[in-house]
Amino acid sequence: VLCMGALYHLFSYEDRMNAMCECVRVCKKGGILAFAYLNKWGNFYNGMINNLKSMDLLYREFDSGNHEDIFFRTTAEEVNKMCQALNLTCLHNIGVDHLAFLSSERIDAMSDEEYAHLLDYQRKAAQEPNIAGASLHGLWIGQK
C-alpha cells in the first residue's frame, strides 16, 4: 500500500494517524506499506540556502512543521514512532534525495559518468540512518 503525499499535507497528528490507519486497514497481513514524508531537517537547510528565508521564519516552520499551510514537515523518528504505534515493522526508513538540492546546477552540468557516480552515492546514502534526516523527502517502508 502506497501513501505518497498524504503525510505532506495533513497538519494534525490525528489526521496523519487516520490516513496511516486506513492504509494499514486495507493492507493484507504481511503486506508492505510505504509512507512518504517531508523531512524538517533537509527542508530547513534548503530554506536557509536556496530560498534565503529569514531565520525567524525558518525556526517557526521547523518548530511547527507547517510550511505556508501547504506542507507539513516531520522527522524520521516521528514517523517511526507513528508506525510503531500501528504495530508495523520497519524495513527501511530512507532519505530519498539527500543533499542534491544544494547543487542542482552542478548536477545539471554532470557528464553521464559523473551522474552515474552520483546515483550510486544516492543509493548508498539512502540507507544511511545518520544522514537520512538531511534529505528533503523521506520514505518509510514497512510490513504489517
Can you annotate each of these PLM segments?
Residues L2:
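A conserved beta-strand element that flanks and buttresses the S-adenosyl-L-methionine
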Residues I32-R60:
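Conserved class I S-adenosyl-L-methionine
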Residues M17-I32:
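A short glycine-rich, Lys/Arg-flanked "PGG" loop and its adjoining helix->strand segment in the class I
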Residues F11-E14, N46:
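Conserved catalytic-core motifs of eukaryotic protein kinase domains, centered on the activation segment
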Residues F11, K28, K144:
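Short conserved AdoMet
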Residues L91-K144:
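A C-terminal cap/extension of S-adenosyl-L-methionine-dependent methyltransferases
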Residues E68-N87, N93:
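Short alpha-helix
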Residues G5-H9:
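Short catalytic micro-motifs in class I SAM-dependent methyltransferases
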